[in-house]
Swiss-Prot record:
Keywords: ATP-binding, Cytoplasm, Disulfide bond, Nucleotide-binding, RNA-binding, Transferase, tRNA processing, tRNA-binding. It is found in: Cytoplasm. This is tRNA-specific 2-thiouridylase MnmA. GO terms for cellular component: cytoplasm. It comes from the Bacteria. Disulfide bonds join C107-C206. Residues 155-157, 315-316 are annotated as: Interaction with tRNA.
């Protein structure tokens, strides 16, 4: 057994996870590689034989080659059933409820970490590691494990990890959090990872590699297209201005693909699944200053006592804005931003930061409705 300990590394077959595994081995850890097969087209509503990215045979073979060439064991685990139940079902249900889901957060919280920790225990591994650009450390004063942004702000993935509880963070290692992406590609070349060093980054949803989520929903839900077609576009005053293809195929803030000639640019400002109605309007009608989030997870503190200044983000790659956050009950966060935010979208993640640390997060449930006075105080609070 290595003095550093035994670590189970999630390996997708990409450059980040491959460098993570080899870097930890170079640092003296006893490394075990694990590739998780989470989906295929036959079980997730698509066409057989079209797997690409992290669940393709090529990617699994790339991970195996890295492990073999660097002398550590590698395993593959089939998580398609769990992924389908937790991620794909909720993804589908959220769109059918008029919300816009974030499947990566669900996968990290309920699939990847649960599966990694279970297999880590089976393989006598003390730690798990991934190629996420984030950092974790133990804070003696708070007696808590803290999650913080990665050094490379362009690649920072702390937003997608807000749902990890303390017991998961306690066993997690993120070696790439201290590096920028160009350094990782340089390391890949230095380590001789020729099969992955120049692989392009992946930005699409892993189980929708063509990024066509309306097509995915139509493939997955029998009769959906016929059921929801013929809905109406309306203005905020109720004036009907056109027909649409069905409410699940649109998202808050969308402008392209509306096929409306109204003499000005309009955006989706509201989605009503009950009436199959989509409200459109000018950009100004997308601006909101308050929100409510549920299913929360607090990282830096066990609970929030009163209003706390924070930096709030409402989607991946959102620059964020100063805000006040408070916790009216165990499972709810309310947030008032110092200035109105564009297209706050139910179903997306709210993530709060305090300096570089993740304060906590939750799923955006309701937009507006929080106290106007709180928004005024947020404008005066330190960012």
């Amino acid at each position: 057994m290595s003095k550093k300990g035994r670590v189970l590394v999630a390996m997708s077959g990409g450059v980040d996870s491959s460098v993570t595994a080899v870097l930890l081995k170079e640092r003296g850890y006893d490394v075990v590689g694990l590739t998780m097969k989470t989906w295929d087209y036959s079980t997730s509503g698509g066409r057989d034989g079209k797997e690409v990215g992290c669940c393709s045979i090529e990617s699994m073979n790339d991970a195996r080659v890295v492990a073999t060439e660097h002398g550590f064991p590698h395993f593959v685990v089939d998580l398609r059933e769990e992924f389908g139940d937790w991620v794909i079902e909720r993804f589908t249900d959220e769109y059918l409820s008029g919300r816009t889901p974030n499947p990566c957060v669900l996968c990290n919280t309920h699939i990847k970490w649960d599966a990694l920790l279970q297999r880590a225990d089976d393989l006598d591994c003390e730690y798990i590691a991934t190629g996420h650009y984030a950092n974790v450390r133990y804070d003696d004063e708070r007696d808590r494990y803290l999650l913080s942004r990665g050094l490379d702000r362009n690649k920072d993935q702390s937003y997608a990890l807000w749902g990890l509880p303390q017991e998961h963070l306690a066993r997690s290692i993120f070696p790439l959090g201290a590096y920028e992406k160009p350094e990782i590609r340089e390391m890949a070349a230095e380590f001789g990872l020729d099969n992955v060093a120049d692989k392009p980054d992946s930005y699409e949803i892993c189980f929708i590699p063509d990024n066509d989520y309306p097509r995915f929903l139509k493939d997955r839900v029998d009769g959906l297209e016929e059921e929801v077609s013929g809905g109406t576009f309306v203005l905020s005053d109720g004036t009907v201005v056109g027909e649409h293809d069905g409410y699940p195929f649109y998202t808050i803030g969308q402008r392209r693909g509306l096929d409306l000639a109204l003499g000005e640019r309009v955006y989706v400002t509201d989605i009503d699944p009950e009436t199959n109605t989509i409200t459109v309007g000018p950009k100004e009608e997308l601006m909101e200053q308050t929100l409510t989030a549920h299913e929360i997870n607090l990282v830096k503190y066990p609970e929030l006592d009163g209003e706390r200044p924070a930096w709030g983000t409402i989607r991946y790659n959102d620059d964020g804005a100063g805000c006040l956050a408070w916790q009216p009950d165990e499972d709810t966060l309310k947030v008032a931003f110092a200035e109105p935010k564009r297209a706050i979208t139910p179903g997306q993640s709210l993530v709060l930061y305090e300096d570089e640390d993740v304060l906590g997060g939750g799923w955006i449930h309701e937009v507006g409705g929080a106290e106007n006075e709180a928004a005024e105080r947020a404008a005066e609070a330190p960012a």
